[in-house]
Each structure stands twice: as C-alpha cells, then as structure tokens.
C-alpha cells in the first residue's frame, strides 16, 4: 500500500504504512509501534478474553491494547480493560470490516463530524486491523467520567436496541452542559449514519463524558457502513 494508513495520503519515499507526522499525532511517538500479532492469534486471544469476561462490550471482537517499550522499541500489547487503545481485528464472518469502519470514520470527518482518534494498523501477517485511541482514559491511564445512553436512560445492555433516538436526544438535553449544541451534533450524526448505511447505532454508541469541566456529547465512535458489510440486513437505522 502506497498511502498512509492514518490519513490516506500518499507516503513519501522511505516511509512505510504511516507518515512521521501521523505516527506522532496518533501514538505520540517518533516511530511506528509494533503490533506483533496475527489475525489468527487475535481471534484466539479474543475468545479467551471473552471467556475470562475482560473484553470490551460489543458484538465485534475488541481487544484493549497498551503502548509500552520493549527492548528499545515501542510495542502494542494486549492488556485488561485499562489499555489506552482499542483494537478490532479482521473477522471471518464479515470481510474487511476494519477497513470499512475506518473509511466510514474518515467520511464523518469530511462531513465535519468530530470523531475519536482512529487509524488502520498492519499486523504481523500483513492483515489490517482498526485501532482507536480511548477518550475515557487520560495520557497517564486515569479514567475519565463517561457514560453511554444505556446508563443514562437506565437500560440494561441487552436492551440497547429497545429505545428511541427521541429518548437519546432528551437525555442529551437533560445532562449536557451545552445542550443545544450537543443535540444538534447528535442530529447531524443520525443523519450521517442514515446516509452511510449505518443501521447499528444503538444506545451504547452514544455517550456523554467530562471534557474541560463540562459534560459533553462524545466525539462519534463505532461508525460502520453495516449495509456494505452485511448486504442482507435491510434495516435503515438501529
């Protein structure tokens, strides 16, 4: 691939996978960290973590990663829930899901929707995974207050599809420090999701968090053109 996995622009001569500036922007390092796992290894680890009940919530396999230094090089290693990054590897059920999610996030940025930091990342077997930097953790690893709409509307996780966007909007108006701005952002995100075939925006995919001493709607995350990934699903919205 001749384009940067972070910004999609052409790489310069001698660069591999990411521009130097993009590495610095996403990881805060001068060299690209190593993700020394294969797709098969991540599948096995994800199953083990789910059995141990230390996985992040959601249907798509997600692994928590921590950036550390090992023998002089930066490496991303799988940890418990406290990791600063979330990794979504390829799946056998849905082809190229990481690429589709990253592209959908890029399209949101083009539409001037604020999104969480994200990138594609090459693994040891040359397959690509999707990485996002967590916004509910500080650079020191401390937890930031953040609650999703299941919590804010008092719904169990298994009932995340049994609600309405009207109810989410009312929760934004009730709890946000800038309610009019955030409910507008929420509406724009719904419109974008409909336009891009994202029919999986359930209650867990909207959250409020503490930012600069204010309670705000979080930047968008988990945006995926589900219709491309699963053409048999003809729903328009969650």
Each model region followed by its residue ranges:
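Anionic ligand-binding catalytic core segments
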Residues: 1-203, 207-238
């Amino acid at each position: 691939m001749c384009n940067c996995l972070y910004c999609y622009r052409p790489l310069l001569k001698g660069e591999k996978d990411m521009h130097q500036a993009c590495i610095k922007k996403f990881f805060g390092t001068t060299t690209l960290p190593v993700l020394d796992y294969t797709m098969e290894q991540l599948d096995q680890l994800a199953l083990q973590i789910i059995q141990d009940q230390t996985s992040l919530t959601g249907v798509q396999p997600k692994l928590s990663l921590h950036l550390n230094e090992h023998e002089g090089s930066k490496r991303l290693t799988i940890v418990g829930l406290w990791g600063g990054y979330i990794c979504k590897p390829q799946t056998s059920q849905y082809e190229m899901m990481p690429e589709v999610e990253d592209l959908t996030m890029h399209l949101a940025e083009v539409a001037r929707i604020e999104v969480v930091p994200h990138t594609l990342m090459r693994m040891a077997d040359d397959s690509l995974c999707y990485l996002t930097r967590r916004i509910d953790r500080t650079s020191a690893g401390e937890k930031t207050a953040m609650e999703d709409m299941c919590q804010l509307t008092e719904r169990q996780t298994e009932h995340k599809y049994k609600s309405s966007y009207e109810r989410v909007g009312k929760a934004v108006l009730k709890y946000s420090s800038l309610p009019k701005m955030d409910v507008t952002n929420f509406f724009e995100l719904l419109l974008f999701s409909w336009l891009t075939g994202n029919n999986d925006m359930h209650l867990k995919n909207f959250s409020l968090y503490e930012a600069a001493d204010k309670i705000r709607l979080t930047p968008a995350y988990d945006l995926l053109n589900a219709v491309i990934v699963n053409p048999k699903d003809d729903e328009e919205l969650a």
